[in-house]
């Protein structure tokens, strides 16, 4: 069964239809009479949250110390097999794999997410390339990590040049790293960026184009699925494509601080 995460922003509040990696319910899709109609989901993957205070983030060059312990490559995904991702095609949103790319396209006010199937990650380093075709202002896209259904982390890149991180727990959203500007975020479309995430234990470090951005320490979800998403926040469509996913093992133990006598 294909699984899909779609949210509709109607009357100022998000109405979402989504699919989950475990025990999920797929959204109802317009289909020919020969296809089976799927039930409707009610999970809100894009719940509202308070507007955080903006702070400035300097972009720094990545060093070996910022992503230590990277070991063997465990996933090389060229997006040649559509069965490995949640895909769907409808009038409001689509997640399709073609020409070795996963394309997410949404109409105004709609969101969509797609998870990589059959993979649960705990300590890892992942890289994925994103190409932005249609995107403006507060529209956004990014990656989902450690997803267990209605709970996950979302690293968000906005088309106004900001990045931030949210934790969604049982459909309740909380900003755990406030929006900051970054010169590595494409200011709208067209654009391209490589997103990297180093996750060990309760710490997650974000990299853009190989450059370290910031670190988040959050121990609520120790493991889960990996995915991608996009969201239209305005009155225009959004289209982004994802390609070249690579995932590596990470074997790293943080050094123990010696107590001061």
PLM feature segments, named:
Residues 171-196:
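Short, aromatic/His-centered strand-loop micro-motif at the edge of beta-sheets
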Residues 93-112:
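Short carbohydrate-recognition loop motifs
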Residues 79, 126-128, 191-206:
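Short tryptophan-centered beta-strand motifs in secreted/extracellular beta-sheet-rich domains
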Residues 216-241:
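Flexible glycan-contacting loops in extracellular carbohydrate-active proteins
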Residues 73-92:
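Short, tryptophan-glycine- and acidic/Ser/Thr-enriched carbohydrate-recognition patches
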Residues 79, 243-247:
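Extracellular beta-strand elements of beta-rich domains used
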Residues 18-72, 76, 248-261:
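Ser/Thr-rich, Proline-interspersed low-complexity disordered segments
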Residues 107-169:
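Secretory/extracellular carbohydrate-interaction modules
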